[in-house]
């Protein structure tokens, strides 16, 4: 909640952010803090450890949707007088754009599934190849980490904000 941020309650997303920004203000009182909201993500599979996976932000996790978290971060940061770059709303990362497809096996072999077609198709990291070949790269390489295209969108919004505040 906004109160978590203002009261710096550790253990919550907003509370932790409140603690972090307070510490930055302590150590750099003249500095300007820019908060960037999180972008949408797809199903993430770590290329170095394919057993490390997380589902995309198209589904709530722990009862929370990423869009609601991003909105709360932006609202709390703005109330605290911080500069906000709302990547979630403005960077163009969507469930459809984070990756072009996810290559998964179904009975008849492998198929390139576009969102939302892949959400209920299981990925078995012990026997299937990595599901994001180079041609699957969209706004991210792997459903989580921004690609050149994703970084360009983020950089553009950040540059605009920095021009406004400098």
Residue ranges, per PLM feature:
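Alpha-helical cap/lid subdomain in secreted, periplasmic
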Residues: 1-152, 156-165
